[in-house]
Amino acid sequence: MHQSSLSLDFFGSPHERVQKALASLRAGGGVLVVDDEDRENEGDLIFPAQTITVPQMAMLIRHCSGIVCLCLTDEYTRRLDLPMMTERNTNTQQTAFTISIEAATGVTTGVSAADRVATIQAAVAENASPENLRRPGHVFPLRAKPGGVLERRGHTEATVDLMRLAGHAPCGVLCELTLDDGSMARLPQVAAFAVAHAIPLCSVEDLVAWRHGLGEENIAISA
């Protein structure tokens, strides 16, 4: 099969796709998640925040948009005293950015892969507090809706849901996959990237179906 013609079906059934994604996350690997063509129509590369490595961060920076985001629950953002980036969110998709962050210690300019990993580690440490972070910085936290993908079908919520289901703390790192010319990767290109790098691929809708199958309609996500 030519890679340009790859579709989600190439990666198995919806259930199998989520299974493979969770297995990768449990092993400290990454996943690719696409949303609906009528929404952002983008694919995000996602890693667990607790275990992300410098090579994984370098991969995000090299192949993605450069806007590295840390997806968090509301409890995390309150614990870290992270206010929303704006009081009135007029973003079309209601993407919930907080003010950006940097680790208070152990970083230089905050831009390198190592510095961004240090910032994420500072934010998600078990004893993390507002004093561990500087504001603004080069990592962009996103606040997930409490109901996850059952409340909002976004990459932020998909990331937090996947981490929880994989047994990680509900926090993950994402960045949007881009092409060499700087344009956004769509499903065929995301699928080809997944095959080339042996990364599982699933969709937000796959995760919605998985959660419905678990009878989780009323289960909120918490830290």
UniProtKB/Swiss-Prot annotation:
Binds 2 divalent metal cations per subunit. Magnesium or manganese. The record marks 138, 176 as: Essential for catalytic activity. The keyword Lyase applies. InterPro entries: DHBP_synth_RibB-like_a/b_dom (IPR017945), DHBP_synthase_RibB (IPR000422). Its cofactor is Mg(2+); Mn(2+). Its EC number is 4.1.99.12. GO terms for cellular component: cytosol. The keyword Transferase does not apply. Mg(2+) 1 binds at residue 40. One of its GO terms (biological process) is riboflavin biosynthetic process. Pathway: Cofactor biosynthesis; riboflavin biosynthesis; 2-hydroxy-3-oxobutyl phosphate from D-ribulose 5-phosphate: step 1/1. D-ribulose 5-phosphate binds at residues 39-40, 44, 152-156, 176. GO terms for molecular function: 3,4-dihydroxy-2-butanone-4-phosphate synthase activity; magnesium ion binding; manganese ion binding. NCBIfam families: ribB. Catalyzes the conversion of D-ribulose 5-phosphate to formate and 3,4-dihydroxy-2-butanone 4-phosphate. Homodimer. PANTHER family: 3,4-DIHYDROXY-2-BUTANONE 4-PHOSPHATE SYNTHASE, GTP CYCLOHYDROLASE II-RELATED. HAMAP family: RibB. Belongs to the DHBP synthase family. This is 3,4-dihydroxy-2-butanone 4-phosphate synthase.
